[in-house]
Amino acid sequence: MEKLKQQFSKDRLITPSSNLVRNYIDSIPVDLLIDILSRFPPKSIARFYCVSKLWESILRGPDFTELYLTKSVALRRLFFALKVNTELLVFSSPQPQIPDENSSLVVEATPYKCFPKKIPTEICTALGGLVFLGTFLSRQPLVIVNPLTGEFITLPKLKTIGTKRFSFGYDPISKKFKVLCVTWSPCGTLPNIHQVLTLETGERLWRTIHDPVIPRYSINYDAICINGVLYSEAYYQGSSKIVCFDFKIEKVSFVNIDGMCNLRLFNCKGKLGVHQYDVQSRNEKLVFHVLEDAEKHKWSKSICILPSVVSGKRIVEITCTGEIVFSPSGGSLHPFYIFFYNIERKTYTRVQIKGFKKYADCVHTFLDFVEDTKLI
């Protein structure tokens, strides 16, 4: 917060001496003020935190946040995190409207210049306007960043002993971001420890989840949060399963996956999709499963033949309009393309993203990123 205040202190819209102007603005009815402020672009909203305590309170409130994000649905963006040597670069671009026929589009990616660069980057999750960063080594710090404002926080360390996996999610009921830590002991006999940190104002503390049915299991690195449920591949009782952690009720459950393993998890129109990764496959045929009913362990299976242009690309997501989105995972990024392939029409759109550096060690691509002005 202090960093943000210093950044805008020189060019505030209302200076400390403008008491009459501030008093007049603060006399505007709150409902009207919320509506007026919701019409401004994100960068302007970030400046308004410094106008007055009333404005800061309004901008932090759930009513403004919900209204602003609702209006921002049409402003969803593509978000990219690039690792170049030890430096992390983040960009976003407009998320294009996909035409009905084969086509090529070009969009310009703009960097977030105030994003801190020298921070852990092995784990990268963009969710709801925030970015969660960390490493697989528990001694390294975990960081949550708002790329629009440049504000970031370092999460408190845990004292539990054992192998840890951290995941980032969102609880749509309480409208709060949460971080899950799963720890399993090195001795191999004790049940896993589940701890949750809720991202909110005030002191940030890890809470241990006391669930008597939690067994011992090990989880893969890949995890995805969909509609408040965190999914990841797990190894439990000698077989591969999907472990589900519901952030809304903070409970663990498992879903059978019929012998599949080495899975890539993705969002498929608001449901969990899994694709069995085969390093020798050239992606000429895509076989994926969609979780239809977690309680009944019910999956649907789809097979589609892919065009050669997406061979070797990584699945990012299947959009609500039915496009499979593919992105390169790293290497040469000049030029950099992502592909939208429509399963029903069998058409693809190649989107060139301009503005990247030529090479990167890895690149993370996210859809439907909405810039959020709310401070952490």
UniProtKB/Swiss-Prot annotation:
Q: Which residues form the signal peptide?
A: none
Fetch the SUPFAM superfamilies from UniProt: F-box domain (SSF81383)
Which InterPro entries does UniProt cross-reference here? F-box-assoc_dom_typ3, F-box-assoc_interact_dom, F-box-like_dom_sf, F-box_dom
Q: List the disulfide bonds.
A: none
Q: Name one Pfam family in it.
A: FBA_3
Q: Which residues form the F-box domain?
A: 22-71
Q: Which domain of life is it from?
A: Eukaryota
Q: What is this protein called?
A: Putative F-box protein At1g53370
